[in-house]
């Protein structure tokens, strides 16, 4: 039997690369598959001159794709998990993830190797409030300016001198073969916790599509799927948006236990709080919710 799958994705070079990685995985288990990539322009792609938190948040990168899924114009959607809100339409599910790439951020700068080395009042291009929060924690004198666009366009803006530096995700740079050690420098977790789900490619389907669910079960990287549960539970409980400084990073302590570092901030009060939870994989979601409750309480003091 020949399968035919319509795969929805954004039009960016990175999104198309990630979609092809999903296709490669599916072909290992369903070799006779026919597939059609359906590139979709999202609202987030169209509006480039404003910060995401002013126009509706990262959900704008999913809205049109999820609608196509609900309308049965596509069979599955491929996303960067970091762009997926904690709460998605109830008729859809994240049915699979690929193995997580290194989720660290990268300091991209032509002259300096770290945020600390930048000259006084230097300009860093970044539209993410998470990154802005960490940058200001490290160097309060630096100016953080709105910096939108795909990876290639942001690097070009940097090369053209529009900013002194920017921060990008290592996973995207690696997949685009754009990590250049001459001007790309990894930032350690101790200095900047990653975005929730960073480095993970996610597959979203309709909840009632049993055929697609069976396919997704075959490609799902279970250790990554378990690893992101406390991060996603934290995000879902807080129903956080792009105005909320939020971060989390999970790692395995052994095959049954996960440690997750969380960060939550409040832009109005400029408060930031950190918390760590260690949990068995069977209760990892509860750990994310517990962390959210503790940290909300700390911010309210």
UniProtKB/Swiss-Prot annotation:
<dbReference type="InterPro" id="IPR022418">
    <property type="entry name" value="Porphobilinogen_deaminase_C"/>
</dbReference>
<protein>
    <recommendedName>
        <fullName>Porphobilinogen deaminase</fullName>
        <ecNumber>2.5.1.61</ecNumber>
    </recommendedName>
</protein>
<comment type="similarity">
    <text>Belongs to the HMBS family.</text>
</comment>
<keyword id="KW-0627">Porphyrin biosynthesis</keyword>
<dbReference type="InterPro" id="IPR000860">
    <property type="entry name" value="HemC"/>
</dbReference>
<dbReference type="GO" id="GO:0004418">
    <property type="term" value="F:hydroxymethylbilane synthase activity"/>
</dbReference>
<feature type="modified residue" description="S-(dipyrrolylmethanemethyl)cysteine">
    <location>
        <position position="242"/>
    </location>
</feature>
<comment type="function">
    <text>Tetrapolymerization of the monopyrrole PBG into the hydroxymethylbilane pre-uroporphyrinogen in several discrete steps.</text>
</comment>
<comment type="subunit">
    <text>Monomer.</text>
</comment>
<dbReference type="GO" id="GO:0005737">
    <property type="term" value="C:cytoplasm"/>
</dbReference>
<keyword id="KW-0808">Transferase</keyword>
<dbReference type="InterPro" id="IPR022419">
    <property type="entry name" value="Porphobilin_deaminase_cofac_BS"/>
</dbReference>
<dbReference type="InterPro" id="IPR036803">
    <property type="entry name" value="Porphobilinogen_deaminase_C_sf"/>
</dbReference>
<dbReference type="GO" id="GO:0006782">
    <property type="term" value="P:protoporphyrinogen IX biosynthetic process"/>
</dbReference>
<dbReference type="Pfam" id="PF01379">
    <property type="entry name" value="Porphobil_deam"/>
</dbReference>
<comment type="pathway">
    <text>Porphyrin-containing compound metabolism; protoporphyrin-IX biosynthesis; coproporphyrinogen-III from 5-aminolevulinate: step 2/4.</text>
</comment>
<dbReference type="InterPro" id="IPR022417">
    <property type="entry name" value="Porphobilin_deaminase_N"/>
</dbReference>
<dbReference type="Pfam" id="PF03900">
    <property type="entry name" value="Porphobil_deamC"/>
</dbReference>
């Amino acid at each position: 039997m020949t399968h035919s799958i319509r795969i929805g994705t954004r039009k960016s070079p990175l999104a198309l690369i990630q979609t092809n990685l999903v296709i490669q995985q599916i072909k290992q288990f369903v070799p006779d598959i026919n597939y059609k990539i359906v590139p979709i322009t999202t609202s987030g792609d169209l509006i480039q001159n404003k910060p995401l938190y002013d126009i509706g948040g990262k959900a704008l990168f999913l809205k049109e794709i999820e609608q196509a899924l609900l309308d049965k114009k596509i069979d599955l959607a491929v996303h960067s998990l970091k762009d997926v809100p904690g709460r998605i339409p109830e008729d859809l599910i994240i049915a699979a993830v690929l193995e997580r790439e290194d989720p660290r951020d990268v300091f991209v700068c032509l002259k300096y190797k770290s945020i600390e080395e930048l000259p006084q009042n230097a300009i860093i291009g970044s539209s993410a409030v998470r990154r802005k929060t960490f940058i200001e924690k490290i160097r309060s004198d630096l100016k953080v300016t709105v910096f939108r666009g795909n990876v290639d366009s942001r690097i070009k803006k940097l090369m053209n001198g529009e900013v002194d530096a920017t921060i990008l995700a290592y996973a995207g740079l690696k997949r685009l073969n754009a990590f250049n050690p001459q001007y790309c420098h990894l930032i350690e977790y101790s200095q900047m916790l990653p975005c929730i789900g960073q480095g993970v490619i996610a597959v979203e389907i309709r909840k009632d599509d049993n055929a697609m669910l069976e396919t997704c079960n075959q490609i799902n990287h279970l250790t990554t799927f378990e690893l992101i549960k406390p991060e996603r539970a934290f995000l879902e409980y807080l129903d956080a948006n792009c105005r909320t400084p939020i971060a989390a990073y999970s790692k395995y302590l052994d095959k049954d236990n996960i440690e997750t570092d969380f960060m939550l901030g409040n832009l109005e009060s400029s408060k930031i709080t950190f918390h760590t939870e260690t949990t068995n994989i069977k209760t990892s979601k509860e750990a994310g919710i517990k962390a959210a409750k503790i940290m909300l309480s700390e911010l309210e003091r």
